[in-house]
Amino acid sequence: XXXXXXXXXXXDGHCIPALGFGTYKPIEVPKSKAMEAANLAIGVGYRHIDTAYAYQIEEEIGQAIQSNIKAGIVKREDMFITTKLWCTCFQPELVRPSLEKXXXKLQLEHVDLFIMHYPVPMKAGDNDFPLDEQGKLLLDTVDFCATWEALEKXXDAGLVKSIGVSNFNMRQLERILNKPGLKYKPVCNQVECHVYNNQSKLLDYCKSKDIVLVAFGALGTQRYKEWVDQDSPVLLNDPVLCGGAKXXXRSPALIALRYLVQRGVVPLAQSFYESEMKENLQVFEFQLSPEDMKILDGLNKNFRYLPAQFFADHPEYPFSEE
């Protein structure tokens, strides 16, 4: 099944497959299940796999990739693998070691895309969420522009093909784009994006700068208890979305993904079920009419399932503005 042939061209000449597979797993899901999911995803045709240091799953994802390469299902060059730099590793001298560690866990010579997970530097050390005695986050004063220069060096060293950011607002993107001596601009900004938060302003801005907007939470997240308010609306139960799905004889998930793809967004779809994985790949097989798109635009309420409240006191907290 050679699916997901559609790709978005990035500013540096590389291509990003237009639908990705997300690998975040809630605490209650065992790592073996996440590895099995990644294995299935590659088997049914996903070539773009998105992971991160913070998901604590890179080794399992690496095993899934390797087993598919060994079985002759894919070649390394057909795969597009993203991982992310965690916020406690923003000191420039920590960037390359972090990238090398990630590549070793993933069993890869290089990753295709390495991105800053949040624009929020935190104190380096063994703790991923370093707190003081009062339970306040320990921040780091390093400027993420200095971190960016270290990402550029890793690209020059051949450890990564493309570099980008995640959860940056427009002002923060501007700071990198206007940085003196900028060598490579971010190829993407990965943010929460779905029909309830369609990011239209940020998307227009990113398009104007030739930055691909990658969407996590494209289906309204898996509503993991540790991060998502359980009273938040269930996106895939939205009556308008479900009505549109009925009319187009597709599932609500496919309509939600197609809405993003049609706007030039690269969605990450997450699932532990093979039937859903296969179905989500059908996003390239149909189109929504301009009327349908307008109706879906009307669902936007700038709602975040993942407001990253744990960073709310940080001076770089990205979500107080667009």
From Swiss-Prot:
InterPro entries: AKR (IPR020471), AKR1C (IPR044482), Aldo/ket_reductase_CS (IPR018170), NADP_OxRdtase_dom (IPR023210), NADP_OxRdtase_dom_sf (IPR036812). Substrate binds at residue 117. Keywords: Alkaloid metabolism, NAD, NADP, Oxidoreductase. Optimum pH is 9.3 with NAD as the cofactor. It holds the Pfam family Aldo_ket_red. The active site is at 55 (proton donor). The N-terminus is blocked. NAD(+) binds at residues 20-24, 50, 166-167, 190, 216-224, 270-280. GO terms for biological process: alkaloid metabolic process. It catalyses: morphine + NAD(+) = morphinone + NADH + H(+); morphine + NADP(+) = morphinone + NADPH + H(+). Monomer. Catalyzes the dehydrogenation of morphine to morphinone. The enzyme also exhibits significant activity for a variety of cyclic and alicyclic alcohols. In addition to xenobiotics, the enzyme catalyzes the dehydrogenation of 17-beta-hydroxysteroids with much higher affinities than morphine. Uses both NAD and NADP, but the activity is much greater with NAD than with NADP. This is Aldo-keto reductase family 1 member C13. The gene is AKR1C13.
